[in-house]
Amino acid sequence: MNSISETSPEPIYRWVIVSASALMLALSMGMIVNGTSVFFIPLFDEFGWQRGEVSLINTSGLVGLAIGGIFMGRIADKTPIHWVVLFGATVIGLCMLGASQADALWQFYLLFFIAGFLGAAAIFAPLIANVGRWFKTGAGLALGIATAGQALGQGGMPYVLALLI
């Protein structure tokens, strides 16, 4: 008797999933992790805040991501992943829109915490889990490519965002 892997090869479509995941991770993690660094000097100049205060905006997003990952991973186990990721992308977009209108430090802290907790966390953990599900063998390579997107986004997003200033 043949095993499933011998009779039906894994679909090529799985590499589309890996590529799309890498792109989504690049955009979301690039924005939450390093994207805010581009706006530090404009925030210093506009509001007169101290470096530590402005840096805490980034920290609040990362803390939100760390805590939210636990909850969003669990939700992704019970909900179709595409809905969780769509929700996360929408939250990040709305939080960035809100941040463009914010004029108090606490508003930035709150918006970036929410963007991390409900946004980036709803993208990171579910996408990584989803990529792994598409591979019976070679999951390590696929996960490496997907997470490389995250690293490229963290390095490249500041340059892209600098064009907006």
Predicted region positions:
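Residue-level signature of mid-helix packing/kink "hotspots" within the transmembrane helices
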Residues: N34, L62-I70, G155
